[in-house]
Amino acid sequence: MIIINKRNLFFLISVWLLSTLLSAQNVTISTPHTQLLLSVPNGGTPEQLYYGSRTSDADIRSICETARRRNAYPVYGMGYPCETALSVRHADGNLTLQMAVIGVKETRLTKENATLTVIELKDKVYPFFVNICYKAWQDADVIETWTEIRHEEKKPVQLQQFASAYLPVRRGNVWLSHLSGAWANEGQLCQEALQPGMKVIKNTDGVRNSQSAHAEVMFSLDGKPQENTGRVIGAALCYSGNYKLRIDTQEDDWHHFLAGINEENSWYNLKKEEVFRTPALALTYSDEGMSGCSRKFHQWARLHKLANGNTPRKILLNSWEGVYFDINEQGMDQMMGDIAAMGGELFVMDDGWFGDKYPRKNDSYALGDWTVDKTKLPGGLQSLLDNARKHGIRFGIWLEPEMANTKSELYEKHPEWIIKAPEREVVCARGGTQVVLDLSNPQVQDFIVQTVDELMNSYPDIDYIKWDANMSIITQGSQYLTKDNQSHLNIEYHRGFENVCRRIRASYPQLTIQACASGGGRVNYGVLPYFDEFWTSDNTDALQRIYIQWGTSYFFPAIGMGAHISASPNHQTSRSVPLKFRIDVAMSGRLGMEIQPKNMTEEEKALCRNAIAEYKTIRPVVQFGDIYRLLSPYDKQGAASLMYVSPEKDKAVFYWWKTEHFCNRHLPRVKMAGLAPDKYYKVHELNRIDTEPLKFEGKSFSGAYLNDNGLEIPSTHRVEPSKQNEYASRVLYLEEVTPSFSDNRIEQRPPLRVLCLGNSITRHEYKADIEWFSEWGMAASKEENDYCHQLEKMLSQNRPGTVVTPLNIAYWERNLNCSIDSLIGAHTTDKDVIVIRLGENVQDKEAFKSDILRLVEYCKRKANKVVITGCFWKDDEKERAIINAAHMYGLTYIPIDWIDRLYDSRPKVGDTLYDIHGKPYTVTKDFIIAHPDDKGMKKIAEAIYRVL
C-alpha cells in the first residue's frame, strides 16, 4: 500500500501541473528520422527550438529547457530587428502586427500518411489571424510548412510581404548551395560560404521560375559541402510562380532564412474572411551530406510530389530536333517505325502539327488554334494513332495551352483573353506575335481544360502530352482583374494555372504529362504533383547535360528528368560528341531520343537498340534507386561520376564520364558509395564499344571494397583507330552475387522455399460458372506460364530444387481482420521467402491500411525474407498503403501496375487458354480478361525474380 500525505500530494500535483504546462507549451513535429520542436505558449509568441535528426523524449525535455529560441514566424512593426515573414497594411492604415498563440490543432491525415499540426495566431488588437501549418510525412523525411492568413476587419487588408516560412540556421561555417542558369544552361550549381548581409534568390518571370534560378537550396552546416558526409538542411519552395528566398545575416548568431512568393509588385488586397494560403516550403535534414539530402527529396517526390511517381517512365522519341516544324504524316510514321525497331515505347510529335486559317509553319502562327493542319496530316491524329498501334508503341503530342499568337483565330475571337496592361498596346515576344493568355480569367481556364478534353475525348489513346510554355509575362496588367487588383496578376495567374492542372489531372490520372517551359523553366515542386516529368533543358549536348543534370539532381529524381540522345554535331552547341558518350549521359535520367533516325547509320541504330534494351534492365534502379553523387564535374578534376543503388542494395548502376580533355591528364580513382559492405557485386559494363572487355568485367567485389576503393576506370576506349576520339564514358551494372573466393566465379546457391500469398492472379481453382477451367494463376494459358511457375523456373537456374508454392488468400482481402494464422499459418512452415502479392479484391481501403501491416508483421516472423508487390490494377490509395507497409517493416516493394500500361499484357475475348486436361478453350468472360496474360505473368515473375 502507498501512503500519500499532504506534502507528497502537493509535490505530485505540482509535478503533474508542470508536466502538463510543458506539454501544452511545446509541440514536436516528427518524420521517421527528422524532428522540429516548437514552443507555443498560449497568449505568447511561437518559437522554434530545434530542427534536425529525430531525438529521444529525454533530449526533447532538455532542449525545451535549454535551447535558444527564435520566433517561428516573425512579423513586422513591433521591435523584431531582422527580416520579417509577414507585413501588412491594416484597413485603418496601421502597419504593425503583434501575433499571439490562441490554439494548437493536430490532425492525422490517414489517406496521405501524414500528420498536420496547425498553430493558430491572432493579433493582440486587430481581428487578424495567421495559421502556421506543418505537414509531417510519415513515410518520407520531409516537413512541409505554410501559412494561412485571414482577417475580420471591415475593409481589405493589404498583404505587403507574406513568406511561407521562416527558418533560423545557426551561424558557423555554413555554406549555401543553390542553382542558377539561363536558357540552355539550366541547373548550374553554385556554392558559397554565407557572409554577413542579405542574400536574395528570386524570380520575376511570371510564367517560368527555374531557368535563371531555382526555389530550392541546401545549407551545409559543417563547412564546405560534401556529397556523402556532413549535416545538411534542404529547403524547396513548392510554387510555380515568382518567388523570393532571403537569407539575412546580421550581428546575431543566426542566418535568418525566409522563403515565399515574391511580393514585389504583387501586394495583395485581402478581403474580409478570405483565406490567403502561401505555398508550402518543404524541409528535410540529413547527416549524410548533400546526396543524403537529395535522396530524401527524391523519395518524397516519388511518393507524394510527382504524378504517378511509382510508375516506370517509357523510352521515347521526340520529333523536335529531328524535323522541327516540318511535320508530315509519312515522316511521322517512319519515325515511329524507327523508334519501335530500336525498342522504344513511345513517340511524341512535337510543335508544328496544328493550325487551320493560320498553319503552324513557324513560331509566329496558330498558338491557340488546336486543330490539325490537314495539309500536313491529311489522315488527322487518328491515322497517327493507328500507325503507332501498328508499330506496337504509344503516341504523344505537344501543346502550349497557355499561349497564343496574334496571328491566330483564338486571338481574333478573344483579344480580351491575353495579358495586357490597361491603356497600353499589346507587347509580343517569341516569333514577334506570341502573347500569354490571362489565366486569372476563369474563361481562359475553361478554354484550356476544354482544349485538353476535346483532344482526349476525340483521341483517348493519346498516352502523353508535352506541355510547353515559351514566354514570360513581359507586360504587367490584366484585362480581367479590377483596377484595384492589378498587383494580383502574378499570383492569380498561378492560381489559375494550378486550377487547370488539378482539373486535367483529375480527369486523366494515367495520362503522362511533361512540364516543358523553354526547356527547364518549370522544374519545381509547385507543378510536379500534376506532371509526370520535366524537360530538363532545351540543350541536349551531352557534355553540357552532365552539368545541367547534375545540378538538377540535387532536388529532383531521375524518374522525372527527361534526358535525350540527340544528333552530332549538337544543334545547340555545334559540338561533335560520339554516340556512346551521348547514350551514357542520357541513360542517367529518363532515357529518350531527340534525333532523326533515318539519318543514323545501321551501326548507330544497333548501338541505340542495344542501349535501350540495357536501359530496360536498369530502369528500376535508375528511376527508383537512391542517388550517390561521387565526383562532381564542377570540381574540375577531369571527370564526373554518380551512381544509383536499389533500395534493397542488391543492384546498382555506376556512371563515369570524362569531362575535360588534356594530354597526360591523370584522372582520380572514384570510390563508390551506398553499397552494402557485406554483399558482393558482379560487375558488367553496359553499352560496351571496346574491342576487349574491361579487366574487371564479370568479376565480383565486396561492397566494402568498392565503397573504400572503387575501380580503376580507363580514360580511353580501345577501339579501331578511325573511331578514336577524346571522349570516354562508362556505365557499369552491379548485381549482388554469392562469390566463390577461389576463382571469382558465381557458385550455385541452395534452393529456396518460396510461398506466394495472392489472389486469383496467383492461383484460382476450377470454376465453371465463370468459364475458368484451370487451377493456376488466372489468365495464364497454361500452368507453366503463370507467374509462380515462371518464377520457380527462373530461380531454379542457379538455385536447383527451388519450390514456389502459390496460396490464394482472397478470403483475407474480402474479410480483413480475420485470423491470419488460421488462414496461412500451416503453409508458412520452413519457408525461406514469402511474397505478398495482394490487394486487387480489397473493398475496405481504410481497414486495408492497418491490416496489411498486420499481415506483413506476421510474415516477417515466419520467413527470413519477405517482399511485397503492388497491385496489378492501379489504385493509388491501396498502393500507398502497401508502400507504407514496406517502408515500416523494411520490405522490398515491387511496383507492378506499370506492366499493364507499358505492355499489352491482358488476354482478349477470343484468345485461347488450356484447361486442366490440356484441352483448348476460348476466352469469353470479361472477368478473366482483367487478369494478366502469359506476357504479363512473365513480367510479374521477372520483377520478383530481380529481387530474389
Task: Identify what each model region corresponds to.
Residues H33, L95-V101, Y268-D287, Y727-E735:
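Short Pro-Gly-centered flexible turn/kink motifs
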Residues D373-G380, E412-H414, I418-K580, S588-E604:
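Active-site neighborhood of glycoside hydrolase catalytic domains
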Residues Q25-L38, G44-D248, E264, Y680-F696:
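Polysaccharide-binding surfaces and accessory modules of carbohydrate-active proteins
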Residues N308-Q450, Y459, Y464, K849-I852:
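Aromatic-lined carbohydrate-binding/catalytic grooves of carbohydrate-active enzymes
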Residues C871-L948:
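Catalytic His-Asp segment of secreted/periplasmic serine-dependent ester chemistry enzymes
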Residues E747-L755, T762-K849:
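Conserved SGNH/GDSL esterase-like catalytic core that processes O-acyl groups on lipids
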